[in-house]
Regions:
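Active-site-proximal beta-alpha core segment in soluble small-molecule metabolic enzymes
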Residues: 1-119
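C-terminal active-site-proximal or functional interface alpha/beta core segments in diverse enzymes
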Residues: 86-200
Length: 200
């Protein structure tokens, strides 16, 4: 808030109240975005799934009425966008189609109530191939789904390509130090670890 960044993304109604209070104490009105939890299964590894109702991220879309009540009395914030992110390593085009449809519908709810939504962040999660059985989604398919869903909308769209841009830009080279056997399973002990290439 002190640095006047473009916006602060809000993850919960409680956080909205706290951010509004801090802005009030600093006599500022700040731009915020709301991260929604659209209850979409990214059909990915459970540990990197972030958009189901039971996941910890975002505000459940079933709580929009409660959110609007708090927004109405939060005079030191200015809502300018919404976002979501349902996970990483998504290889199914139908997941993206569902994200786009739900985010468009949610944006329309905010617009109909009178919020001046200037941007909608569609998240990311495009899968990258770490093995031969993982077939990459065509960017053309993603583009076609976006073009089909978002026609003449009054806001800008953003997408988070993340590791899709850089995952294949390098390799991890490590040395096997020893082989450890636990319970009949061989484990290769290397001089690299999770801190070197964090993956679930």
């Amino acid at each position: 808030i002190e640095k006047n960044i473009r916006l602060i993304n809000i993850e919960s109604i409680d956080e909205l109240e706290r951010v509004n209070k801090v802005a009030l104490n600093q006599n500022k009105k700040i731009n915020i975005g709301i991260r929604l939890n659209p209850n979409i299964d990214g059909l990915t590894i459970d540990k990197i799934s972030t958009g189901k109702k039971t996941d910890k991220f975002g505000i459940d879309t079933d709580k929009l009425n409660e959110l609007f009540q708090v927004l109405d009395v939060s005079k030191n914030v200015n809502l300018i966008g919404i976002s979501c992110h349902v996970g990483s390593q998504i290889f199914n085009i139908n997941v993206f189609a569902e994200i786009f449809q739900k985010m468009k519908a949610n944006a329309q709810i905010f617009l109909d109530i009178g919020y001046d939504i200037k941007h909608v962040d569609l998240g990311g999660g495009l899968g990258v191939s770490y093995s031969q059985d993982q077939v990459l989604l065509s960017l053309e398919l993603i583009k076609n789904e976006i073009n089909k869903c978002f026609v003449n909308v009054p806001y800008k769209l953003s997408f988070e390509p993340g590791r899709y841009l850089v995952a294949n830009a390098g390799i991890l080279v490590t040395t096997i130090i020893t082989i450890k056997n636990n319970g009949g399973i061989n484990y290769l002990i290397t001089d690299a670890g999770m801190h070197t290439l964090i993956r679930p």
